[in-house]
Amino acid sequence: MIKAFENHEIWFVTGAQLLYGGDAVVQVDGHSSAMVDGMNASGLLPIKVVYKGTANSSKEVADLMTAAEADKKCVGVITWMHTFSPAKMWIHGMQILRKPLLHLHTQFNKEIPWDTMDMDFMNLNQSAHGDREYAH
């Protein structure tokens, strides 16, 4: 970690929704935590990334962005849409956030499991048009 960033952090927030049930959100949290752990363990980032949870509603997004704005240690936010997270759910929160934003447009898995892919996998791992809308 670069000394200039030792008292700062970047927040990682995952977007999802409860459409697919609580079990899916638990899996989303696991994937998100693994990504953040991997980022921090890589030694490639000059700053610590802190997982702040999965936002499943407009209120949760707005609350997280308000907290990010108020926290002097937070210098920016990384967002990742794991399951289908409607872009409109993020509008108010993005209007609150004035710190730098990085949006990851990717999936959790390194490889797509073409041979075993089913609708449960698709529902858990899609971000679909909500992710694309969010990026704009």
Regions found by a protein language model. Give the residues of each.
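Metallocofactor- and cofactor-centric catalytic cores in central/energy metabolism, strongly enriched
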Residues: M1-H136
